[in-house]
Amino acid sequence: PLVITLGTMYLFGGSALLLSGMAGATGYEGIGGFPTAFTDFANISFLGIPMPLIFFLVCCLFFWLLMHRTHMGRNVFLIGQSARVAQYSAIPVNRTLYTVYAMTGCASAIAAVLLVSYFGSARSDLGASFLMPAITAVVLGGANIYGGSGSIMGSALAALLVGFLQQGLQMAGVPNQISSALSGALLIVVVVGRSVSLHRHQILEWYSR
């Protein structure tokens, strides 16, 4: 899945770049001229809550119910632990995976529409800077990189934490390159800490020799 994900990411990214007339490579304005109602949608508030935050909360609630209160979510966790065991348990592995990929694509599309509405222009590389912070937030929120466990609310809180951290760094005048490096360093620390926690007994036995 990782190789296919990386391959399709570059495939669709390059295709979007060509379809947009190389807007992300030769210019920085992107595709504009959208209706005012569309560009104002992501910049309005409802009861004092910004519209992107409302979508974020609704998506968190939906996926929390899906992953922790339905058979679909249980099947996803079981497949993450062992796809072969899940298949022997009469769980529709392929259908479940295709459904997960489809829902991930829909969630990405919603995020893309909100980004275009917020910035008022469309670029093929508009969300490229969110890739590493998103992975960091998911791992920091408790998801196992090897599959089989995770927390929607933990990932949501970690996403807010990473977002506030990056916003604070930008307000402090820290360059984007350093901010990205800090996100990568945080991801490495979290992964190493998780690995140490999972294999602490083996590590203690090795030190006690």
Which positions does each model-derived feature cover?
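Transmembrane helix-bundle core of multi-pass membrane transporters
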Residues: 1-70, 96-99, 119-127, 203-209
